[in-house]
Curated annotation (Swiss-Prot):
Cofactor(s) this protein requires: [4Fe-4S] cluster
Positions with a binding annotation for [4Fe-4S] cluster: 12, 16, 19
InterPro entries in the cross-refs: 4Fe4S-binding_SPASM_dom, Aldolase_TIM, Cmo-like_SPASM_containing, Elp3/MiaA/NifB-like_rSAM, MoaA_NifB_PqqE_Fe-S-bd_CS, PqqE-like, Radical_SAM_PqqE_MftC-like, rSAM
GO MF annotation terms: 4 iron, 4 sulfur cluster binding; catalytic activity; metal ion binding
Gene designation: cmo
Domain of life assignment: Archaea
Domain spans labelled Radical SAM core: 1-214
Described function: Involved in the biosynthesis of a molybdopterin-based tungsten cofactor.
Keywords: 4Fe-4S, Iron, Iron-sulfur, Metal-binding, S-adenosyl-L-methionine, Tungsten
The keyword Metal-binding is annotated on this UniProt entry: yes
Presence of keyword Transport: no
Pfam families: Radical_SAM, SPASM
Protein name: Tungsten-containing aldehyde ferredoxin oxidoreductase cofactor-modifying protein
Length: 356
């Protein structure tokens, strides 16, 4: 295991329509602190572990002991990454993140922070998030370590795709290190009309402009904007495990919760899938279990069908859920837009002495 993702809470202070959280069937909750400490104890058994990452489908800063958790991770010597909308981070918290040497913070922002830029699907309060980024840049300069690295996650829709180059320039001038661009994964039939990877939009000019901006020092990670044959599971390739707030160990974000998604307009039920609970077993026992090891072997070698471009997909019952595919794999990754790099996995890369 090289990356361990912790969903320390599934609650959030915002209500963004494109978020899984608005459409899943699961209950909300916070990871209790004793369980968190047990997970850190278990994590110390993995010598190749590069980073612990506070993420999942919740807002980590909502957790009442968020800063205690940050301090504990850094006290134990782990690298720490955090995904956040940033709106609850106070000046004191931002300053302490820099002083503690938190390694990476990714903020969510989908448009330029101007009054006229209001999107119906994207993350709201872009102006507030931008101010938090400015302050974090200031505090890390005062500390003098250039930590944390700062990234921004952007979800592309028909509402904001034309703004991507301008947003990239803005982030570069703001002092941001990385920009992760991902496509919208529709969670309602209406959202299908907002995707840009169905051939309705020519993204080539936008992509070319973004590459030019990247040469100026902004690390930009882009998705594909059309369906391609190649499949790459970043969660599996980077040896990632994800632990839900209640202790369930899942292989990736896609299987973290139960919800409905729309693959090029076709409805699919995604059912959460766990390989065990760290309340009952050690993380090492779960990670090395026969079932989890076999799953990683299957996904690593892509020994599963491709439902997305199968000619039988509209007449097949297997594609209706992620429970099983026509090759007998449980759960099924055969319809995953994350492995197609249409939806981007938020896995950091270690480049030039820092995580991005």
């Amino acid at each position: 295991m090289k990356y361990l993702y912790l969903e320390i809470t599934s609650r959030c202070n915002l209500r963004c329509e494109m978020c899984f959280k608005q459409h899943w069937e699961d209950e909300e909750g916070d990871m209790d602190y004793d369980l968190f400490l047990k997970i850190l104890d278990d994590a110390e058994k993995f010598p190749e572990l590069k980073m612990i990452y506070f993420g999942g489908i919740g807002e980590p800063t909502v957790h009442p002991r968020f800063m205690d958790m940050v301090r504990e991770v850094k006290k134990r010597g782990f690298a720490l990454g955090i995904s956040t909308n940033g709106t609850l981070l106070t000046d004191e918290m931002l300053k302490e993140l820099a002083e503690l040497g938190v390694d990476l913070v990714y903020f969510s922002m989908d448009v330029l922070p101007t009054a006229q830029n209001v999107v119906t699907l994207g993350h709201i309060l872009a102006g507030v998030t931008a101010e938090k980024i400015k302050k974090l840049v200031k505090y890390r300069e005062e500390v003098g370590t250039h930590k944390p690295s700062i990234g921004v996650e952007v979800v592309v829709t028909k509402e904001n795709y034309k703004q991507l180059p301008e947003l990239a320039r803005y982030l570069l001038n703001l002092g941001v290190d990385a920009m992760l661009v991902s496509n919208l994964l529709p969670l309602t039939p209406e959202q299908v009309n907002d995707i840009v990877y169905d051939g309705s939009i020519d993204m080539t000019p936008i992509v070319n402009e973004l590459y030019k901006i990247a040469h100026n020092g902004l690390y930009i990670k882009l998705p594909y904007f059309e369906l391609k044959t190649e499949r790459v599971c970043d969660f599996d390739e980077n040896k990632v495990a994800v632990i839900r707030w209640d202790g369930e160990v899942v292989p990736c974000y896609r299987f973290l919760h139960t919800y409905r998604e729309y693959i090029f307009g076709r409805e699919k039920k995604v059912n959460t899938y766990s390989f065990g609970n760290v309340r009952e077993k050690s993380l090492a026992d779960i990670w090395t279990s026969e079932r989890y090891t076999w799953f990683r072997f299957i996904t690593k070698n892509y020994l599963y069908p491709s439902c997305t471009d199968c000619s039988l997909r509209d007449a097949c019952d297997f594609v209706k859920t992620t429970d099983i595919d026509c090759w007998g794999n449980e759960p099924s990754c055969a319809d995953c837009l994350w492995s197609r790099r249409i939806v981007m996995c938020p896995i950091p890369q270690y480049n030039f002495g820092k995580f991005l």
